[in-house]
């Protein structure tokens, strides 16, 4: 048996109430079908229909939301997975790699990882992330915990401020401040699936969405060997023990990635590049003709049988030939999407197979579609045109600024809950309303029951007589507020901000 054995990676056990005993191929497939049901029927997936892809608060149903984007990624992920399995079958390597009885789970894990890949994104996308992190940095100043003298620590939270002679506790304070100021959608996705939603998915399915392997509390440089894998936070301090168990169950070395995650990542890269351009045309940011010229000029030197001509040029010519029977827009994007998929999917599949030893070990330190090939150049072309002509458009930038202000404003509104003393907040949690804190009581009542219960569950397990208790209690209180606000849809966040700011509807 080769060292690559996917039976050691496609782990169908669960954290709680795990199936026991030896399972047949059909029984294992049923376990992953259960995962599919849990994911597709979860409220977090439904909320994606009102979260931003590129254009916030969009009323045009033809423009993509996070949900429609995720469904497209799911389809591309399935295509890549099938292509990989088909090629391995042709090479008679399925059995060698322990995949002969696991092709169904292999595909299902990829599909559901694709559907879930944006599940933790806050309202207004990356600008929502930036708003959360900026707001907490302005109060916790994690950089002061690294280099400044203790007397210069600007952290406004007394329990998190560094103290002389408390080095062990100071180390926890540093980790907590760093962690809270590095909210990230992928890390929040892990927290949603395990801690908040308690979906109890199989270890393999959760491994599929652990896209980045750097802890959110990481301080200092990352090793060159894992620079790509650790370029963003992948999980929080609150899920540290769960991720440690996940690594053990999936036989992952520290800071290594689950093999099927590379497929999910490639599917996302392929999907959003074309989709963002199509949505921009739908929004009349530019016409199809203008888009073609943007792409043509951005490609640079042109040759007759270049990848540009085979993909973009071919789509343009075919769409112009059918103008009498179909709209040029629809035709162009249909051909562009098909041409792009037909070139990039086989390439991504072959890259996966060619680099399988490193990918299986979880150490392949780049994306499948990130190399010096023309295929990567094509993806970069789409991305660069989107950056130059879509994301920089005044309408898009104005909406992003509004989104940033909404999230910052909501954090300002809920800030009184973070200003309460430990004892006062504990009493508020127990009694739910306190006459001496009318504003805080009303704000606390507005928090989601699911999020409040998650806070209570974890804090109740902390030893109250420990020196760490005030530090960790405040950490989980910050998580409570971040969980609530990041879980809102764009529209709900917008409406909630206007209601609480007493702005005319």
Swiss-Prot record:
Annotated function: dGTPase preferentially hydrolyzes dGTP over the other canonical NTPs.
Assembly and interaction partners: Homotetramer.
Reaction(s) the record says it catalyses: dGTP + H2O = 2'-deoxyguanosine + triphosphate + H(+)
Needed co-factor(s): Mg(2+)
Matches recorded under Pfam families: HD
Keyword Transit peptide: no
Keywords: Hydrolase, Magnesium
SUPFAM superfamilies in UniProt: HD-domain/PDEase-like
InterPro entries, per database record: dGTP_triP_hydro_central_sf (IPR023293), dGTPase (IPR006261), dGTPase-like (IPR050135), dNTPase_1 (IPR020779), HD/PDEase_dom (IPR003607), HD_domain (IPR006674)
Official protein name in the record: Deoxyguanosinetriphosphate triphosphohydrolase
EC number, as in UniProt: 3.1.5.1
Domain of life: Bacteria
Protein's gene: dgt
Lineage per the UniProt record: Bacteria, Pseudomonadati, Pseudomonadota, Gammaproteobacteria, Enterobacterales
Domain HD: 66-273
Signal peptide: none
NCBIfam families: dGTP_triPase, PRK04926.1
Enzyme class: hydrolase
Family per record: Belongs to the dGTPase family. Type 1 subfamily.
GO biological process: dGTP catabolic process
GO molecular function per UniProt: dGTPase activity; magnesium ion binding
Protein source organism: Salmonella typhi
């Amino acid at each position: 048996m080769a060292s690559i054995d996917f039976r050691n990676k496609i782990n169908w056990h669960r954290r709680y109430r795990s199936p026991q005993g030896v399972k047949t191929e059909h029984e294992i497939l049923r376990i992953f079908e259960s995962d599919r049901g849990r994911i597709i029927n979860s409220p977090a997936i439904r909320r994606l229909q009102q979260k931003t892809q590129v254009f916030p608060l969009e009323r045009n149903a033809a423009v993509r939301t996070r949900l429609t984007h995720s469904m497209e990624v799911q389809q591309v992920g399935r295509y890549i997975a099938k292509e990989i399995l088909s090629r391995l079958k042709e090479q008679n390597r399925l059995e060698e790699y322990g995949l002969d009885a696991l092709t169904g789970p292999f595909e299902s894990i990829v599909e559901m990882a694709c559907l879930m890949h944006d599940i933790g994104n806050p309202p207004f996308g990356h600008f929502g992330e930036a708003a959360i992190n900026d707001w907490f940095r302005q109060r916790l100043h994690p950089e002061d915990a690294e280099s400044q003298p203790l007397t210069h620590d600007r952290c406004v939270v007394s329990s998190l401020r560094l103290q002389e002679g408390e080095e062990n506790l100071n180390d926890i304070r540093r980790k907590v401040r760093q962690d809270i100021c590095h909210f990230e959608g992928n890390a929040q996705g892990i927290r949603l699936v395990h801690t908040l939603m308690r979906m109890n998915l199989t270890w393999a399915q959760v491994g599929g969405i652990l896209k980045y392997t750097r802890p959110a509390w990481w301080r200092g440089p990352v090793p060159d060997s894992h620079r790509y894998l650790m370029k963003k936070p992948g999980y929080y301090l609150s899920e540290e023990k769960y991720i440690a168990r996940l690594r053990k169950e999936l036989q992952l070395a520290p800071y290594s990635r689950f093999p099927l995650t590379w497929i999910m990542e490639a599917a996302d890269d392929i999907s959003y590049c074309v989709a963002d351009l199509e949505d921009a045309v739908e929004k009349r940011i530019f016409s199809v003709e203008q888009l073609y010229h943007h792409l043509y000029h951005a490609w640079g030197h042109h040759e007759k049988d270049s990848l540009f001509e085979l993909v973009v040029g071919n789509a343009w010519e075919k769409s112009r030939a059918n103008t009498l029977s179909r709209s040029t827009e629809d035709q162009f994007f249909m051909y562009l999407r098909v041409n792009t998929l037909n070139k990039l999917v086989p390439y991504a599949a072959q890259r996966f197979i060619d680099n399988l030893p490193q990918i299986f070990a979880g150490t392949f330190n780049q994306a499948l579609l990130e190399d010096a090939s023309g295929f990567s150049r094509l993806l970069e072309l789409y991305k660069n045109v989107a950056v130059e002509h879509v994301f920089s458009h005044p309408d898009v930038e104005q909406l992003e600024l509004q989104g940033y202000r909404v999230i910052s404003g909501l954090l300002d509104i809920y800030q009184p809950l973070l200003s309460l003393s430990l004892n006062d907040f504990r009493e508020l949690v127990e009694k739910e309303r306190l006459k001496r804190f009318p504003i805080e009581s009303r704000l606390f009542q507005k928090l989601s029951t699911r999020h409040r219960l998650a806070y209570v569950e974890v804090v109740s397990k902390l030893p109250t007589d420990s020196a760490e208790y005030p530090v960790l209690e405040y950490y989980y209180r910050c998580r409570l507020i971040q969980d609530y606000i990041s879980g809102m849809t764009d529209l709900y966040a917008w409406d909630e901000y206007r209601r609480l700011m007493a702005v005319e509807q």
